[in-house]
Amino acid sequence: MKNYIIGFLVFLFAGILVGCGDDNEKEIEESSEQKVEITEAEKVDETDIVAVVNGDDIKGETYNLVYSQLKLHAGAFEEEVDNNEIKQATMESLIDRQLLLQQAKEEGIEITEEVVNSEFETIKSENKEALETLLEQYQITENGFKDQLKFELTLNEFLAKTIEVTVTDEEVEEQYEKAKEGNDSIPEFEEIKDQLKKQLLQQKTDEALQAKIDKVKEKSEIEEKI
């Protein structure tokens, strides 16, 4: 199930849409053809509290949003999707997300509604069709998308403020040698070294972020309600 999760959110939608070109639009269109059913029995009442994290409630509305994202994304990679795994992954994602938001608040990071609305309008004006397809595919409203967008903007600021990672040339070369094993068609090192470096930076950032959240989680009060 971990393979389905990008960081602790499922998708950072704005990251998909910002700078969206023909290739990305095609990917969104193709993925929208995936037929994954989400029944009413899988959803919870939007007003129900699904978890409490250090006194902060997580509501059913957010649970349903993340659950649907996870299941639809999983369905693109697996012929059969285990709903219990999706539920577990959803709860883990929501709890990690809430812990991060709490940590961001302690760091003085606050994304205003004005910033969110401005960013949303930019995305909407530049990628209207892709946005509409994405909202339909993941069964979310514009307000739901804005919630995700606010989280992404918060996450970006939190990463910039609290996490610093580096990747050496030696690490990039080592990664290339690993990738080259058994793969004769891999491009020359100079052609993909920048891409490999970005991948390693992202991997290290994800690991550092998860370690930070896991440390906070150890001393947190968490109650799952479902």
Where are these regions (language model features)?
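Charged, solvent-exposed alpha-helical segments that act as regulatory interaction surfaces
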Residues: 76, 129, 164-168, 185, ...
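Solvent-exposed aromatic/hydrophobic patches embedded in short alpha-helical segments
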Residues: 71, 85-104, 115, 140-141, ...
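Surface-exposed patches in mature extracellular/periplasmic domains of secreted proteins
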Residues: 106-108, 113, 185-188, 211, ...
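Short, mixed-charge aromatic SLiMs
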Residues: 115-129, 174-188, 221
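N-terminal targeting/tethering segments
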Residues: 36-140, 145, 207
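Short, low-structural-confidence N-terminal segments
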Residues: 1-82, 178-181, 191-226
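Phenylalanine-focused residue identity feature
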Residues: 8-13, 77, 120, 145, ...
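Charged/polar, low-hydrophobicity segments characteristic of intrinsically disordered regions
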Residues: 130-138, 184-198
